[in-house]
Amino acid sequence: MPDMQYENAARAAGHTWVCGIDEAGRGPLAGPVSVAAVILRADFSLPGLDDSKKISAKKREELYHQLIEHPAVWWAQVEIDAATIDSLNILRATHQGMAAAAMNLQQKYQITIDHCLIDGLPVKQFPLPHQGIVKGDGKSLSIAAASIIAKVSRDQRMAEYAKEFPQYGFERHSGYGTKQHLHALHLHGPCRIHRRSFQPVAQLSLPLDSH
């Protein structure tokens, strides 16, 4: 289970504002990458908080609402859309989202973040001091909190897109390459939220605005 060891170590080293950052949605064929940045106060406590991939959708939803309403949680969330992903590539788009989430968090609460904990490897040219923590969402509570906010926010966005593009079933697979999604892609072609740099979407050469 994640805990506050990384956050506490950063504070012991003299850092005041320690921020956890994580993303959701790097792999899907459609929709945005969602990135959240979270600061947890030292006295933060929320039983059951874990890596978003290890808990049920219902539990994630419960934890999401508890987190965003928690007095000891400061957070910000951003989305990088499919067009930007296609323009930059998925890795650079994700890194852009991480930087934007941290900057939004600073602006939202009028603070200066002095240390970030990022899920995964360190990010080149990141605008703030940081460390990468491989599988950090299972080790750091602030990264775990960010993973839940990023994931649930993205699922909510994909449910909205499902109403706009009902033929794809986004509410069921959130844009991932399931059998149902692939069948719909071949039947209807891609829509404007599909990532045209991703296979097999790239193979379907229909005009961008045809659906």
Where in this protein do the model-derived segments appear?
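RNase H-like, Mg2+-dependent phosphodiesterase core
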Residues: M1-H211
